[in-house]
């Protein structure tokens, strides 16, 4: 999968942009505020219908306009087919329109399935030390793209969670009514856990294999690594209905459900100690890099899909050697990679390193304008 061309209008400081993006590796350099991250934001919008920079999509629309439009043409090389994606946002009425081949998409998940996009930002490298939400999203992104039924199960579970929370907040709770909701809630929760557990077992196996094959340093981490996925319950071997029943009083006081898939988390330990306590910042980055590479490998094995990877400010958290390693492994797995770089010399170095083996393009970004530097 790859984007062959993009066209953005009124996306932050990008007033109008048309770009051939058919290369495997695309490097964008420019000063802070030049529009590099906005360009990646536009590509991300094509695959997610949302922004990775803000929860309020209106902020992505130029302050000089009421409407933003992002267009992309993607090519599935294996199937020999191309398709078009369009995402627009109007500030007036806060209206977002999504079209695939001219037809309105009913849900954003249709967009995500059509154009798998994985993003790596400086925040990504807080995976180990950050909150559990980011780690859950990491797992669910992977499951969504390899298990087609997961979306339906997740949506049904989410509706039940919201309904249960509404009932808890009402203060007018019938135990029999709550029990009826809980039966369905537990059933869907357990199904989500089964999908996650199966995916995570495969991810863990590939991750450890990847670490052991990379270098002596990562091999040592792989030998001592234990990575586990908790499913959001107090105890997995204790009946989940009983656990929900015992937590009702606490849930009523808090006004929300405290047990279930939304409380799941990943624990990473090395030699039995939390990774953040024993791994240097550099070692943590290496481990997280291998996690994302393992996710790409599962996608390749299970679906033969090759996603689009966006890397924002690659030099912020990785030195040159690790940048080359990350990009090499991603390109080897068939990904199309968009990279933003602050330093022109670094961009030129990466271009020179990769251009002989992979079709590489380099661009300069300034005040929302993008100029091709190398073919």
Swiss-Prot record:
One Pfam family it belongs to: SMC_N
Location in or out of the cell: Cytoplasm
Classification via InterPro entries: DNA-binding_RecF, DNA-binding_RecF_CS, P-loop_NTPase, RecF/RecN/SMC_N, RecF_2
Family classification: Belongs to the RecF family.
Function: The RecF protein is involved in DNA metabolism; it is required for DNA replication and normal SOS inducibility. RecF binds preferentially to single-stranded, linear DNA. It also seems to bind ATP.
Xref: PANTHER family: DNA REPLICATION AND REPAIR PROTEIN RECF
Protein name, entry field: DNA replication and repair protein RecF
Organism: Hahella chejuensis (strain KCTC 2396)
């Amino acid at each position: 999968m790859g984007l062959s061309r993009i066209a953005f209008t009124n996306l932050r400081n990008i007033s109008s942009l048309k770009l051939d993006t058919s290369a495997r590796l695309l490097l964008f350099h420019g000063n802070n505020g030049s529009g590099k991250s906005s360009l990646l934001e536009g590509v991300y919008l094509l695959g997610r219908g949302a922004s990775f920079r803000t929860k309020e999509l209106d902020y992505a629309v130029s302050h000089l306009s009421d409407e933003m439009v992002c267009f992309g043409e993607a090519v599935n090389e294996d199937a020999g087919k191309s398709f078009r994606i369009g995402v627009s946002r109007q500030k007036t009425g806060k209206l977002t329109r999504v079209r695939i081949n001219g037809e309105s998409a009913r849900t954003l998940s249709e967009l995500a399935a059509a154009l798998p996009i994985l993003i790596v930002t400086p925040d990504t490298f807080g995976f180990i030390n950050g909150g559990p939400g980011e780690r859950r999203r990491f797992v669910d992104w992977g499951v969504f793209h390899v298990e087609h039924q997961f979306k339906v199960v997740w949506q049904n579970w989410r509706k039940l969670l919201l309904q249960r929370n509404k009932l808890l907040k009402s203060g007018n709770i019938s135990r029999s009514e709550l029990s009826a909701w809980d039966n369905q809630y537990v059933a869907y929760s357990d199904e989500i856990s089964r999908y996650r557990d199966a995916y995570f077992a495969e991810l863990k196996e590939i991750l450890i294999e990847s670490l052991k094959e990379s270098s002596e340093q990562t091999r040592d981490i792989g030998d001592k690594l234990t990575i586990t996925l908790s499913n959001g319950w107090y105890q997995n071997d204790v009946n989940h209905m009983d656990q929900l029943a015992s937590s009702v009083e606490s849930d009523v006081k808090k006004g929300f459900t405290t047990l279930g898939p939304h409380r799941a988390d990943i624990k990473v330990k090395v030699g039995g100690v939390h990774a953040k306590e024993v791994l240097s910042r550099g070692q943590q980055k290496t481990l997280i890099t291998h996690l994302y590479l393992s996710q790409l490998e599962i996608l390749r094995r299970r679906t033969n899909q090759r996603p689009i990877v966006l890397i924002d400010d690659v030099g912020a958290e990785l030195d040159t050697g690790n940048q080359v390693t990350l990009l090499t492994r991603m390109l080897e797995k068939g990904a199309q990679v968009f990279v933003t770089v602050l330093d022109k010399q670094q961009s030129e170095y990466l271009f020179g390193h990769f251009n002989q083996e992979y079709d590489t393009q380099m661009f300069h970004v300034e005040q929302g304008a993008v100029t091709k530097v190398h073919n």
